[in-house]
């Protein structure tokens, strides 16, 4: 899956906004961020072809050990809640599943708070 296909997939999840919130920072113009309920569920580095998504803490060790293309996130992210994904090596279906999972985690958390 290429970057544009991935972007389209994220937007297809519904109620998703995309922004370049770091565009004024050096190198920040290549970091596309996807939001649901006003909160981030995915960071996509357009230059590096990598993605960072939220994940359940109990799933992270197994994914890191067994899933090709899943790696620790950049040092800016908590390894307790986030995983890195290499778009060039991950299986497309796993990429979609992990992205939807991140979307659902964030949406579920913040939809409850709005009620």
Predicted regions and their residues:
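Charge-dense, helix-prone N-terminal extensions
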Residues: 1-115
């Amino acid at each position: 899956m290429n970057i544009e296909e991935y972007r389209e997939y994220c937007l297809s999840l519904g109620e998703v906004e995309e922004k370049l919130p770091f565009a004024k920072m050096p190198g920040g113009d290549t970091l596309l961020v996807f939001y649901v309920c006003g909160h981030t569920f995915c960071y996509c580095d357009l230059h590096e072809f990598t993605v960072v998504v939220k994940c359940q803490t109990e799933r992270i060790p197994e994914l890191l050990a067994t899933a090709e293309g899943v790696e620790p996130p950049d040092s800016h992210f908590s390894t307790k809640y986030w995983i890195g994904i290499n778009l060039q090596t991950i299986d497309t279906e796993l990429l979609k599943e992990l992205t939807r999972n991140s979307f659902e985690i964030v949406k579920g958390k913040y939809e409850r708070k709005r009620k």
